[in-house]
From Swiss-Prot:
HAMAP family (alphabetical): FabZ
Gene this protein is translated from: fabZ
Species this protein is from: Rhizobium rhizogenes (strain K84 / ATCC BAA-868) (Agrobacterium radiobacter)
Classification via InterPro entries: FabA_FabZ, FabZ, HotDog_dom_sf
Active site: 58
Keyword Cytoplasm: yes
Keywords: Cytoplasm, Lipid A biosynthesis, Lipid biosynthesis, Lipid metabolism, Lyase
Protein name per the record: 3-hydroxyacyl-[acyl-carrier-protein] dehydratase FabZ
Length: 157
């Protein structure tokens, strides 16, 4: 990613997200990033649909988005901030910690989840974020997460 692209990107469609993150279907949990504020915050979007594979077993007849996938959506939104800031290209952003996770309301097919991610601090390759997942303006989940940029082994490329 060029220096101009790193500084000018204020939103990202799915194509741009796939340049920032290594995740792919069915594990890419962010469909769009509607706002990236420098390296400080971002808002990612996940449109939850009934045909996603997790709903086959969670739960038949009463589908609910697994909380761990909401956390993953938060982490991927945070990862996009890290990748954009550092222009890491082929390197990876590893999810390191989850603290203070809370699940407030169920998320179901048809919901549009907004992942609000705010950087709390950064030291070297270590980043800390506070994250909220919202549906229709109401917090459905929240967590504090940690991430680390890991330089990819060129032999594994």
């Amino acid at each position: 990613m060029t220096e101009d692209a790193k500084t000018s990107l204020s939103s990202a469609d799915i194509i741009e997200i796939m340049k920032l993150l290594p995740h792919r279907y069915p594990f890419l949990m962010v469909d769009r990033i509607i706002e990236i504020d420098s390296d400080n915050s971002a808002i990612g979007i996940k449109n939850v649909t009934a045909n996603e594979p997790q709903f086959t077993g969670h739960f038949p007849g009463s589908p609910i988005m697994p909380g761990v996938l909401l956390i993953e959506g938060m982490a991927q939104t945070a990862g996009a901030i890290c990748a954009r800031k550092d222009g890491i290209g082929g390197n990876l952003v590893y999810f390191m910690t989850i603290d203070n996770a809370r699940f407030r309301k169920p998320v179901v097919p048809g919901d549009r989840v907004e992942f609000h991610v705010v950087k709390q601090k950064q030291r070297g390759t270590i980043w800390k974020f506070h994250c909220d997942a919202k549906v229709d303006g109401s917090v459905v989940a929240e967590a504090d997460i940690g991430a680390m940029i890991v330089r990819k082994d060129p032999d594994q490329a």
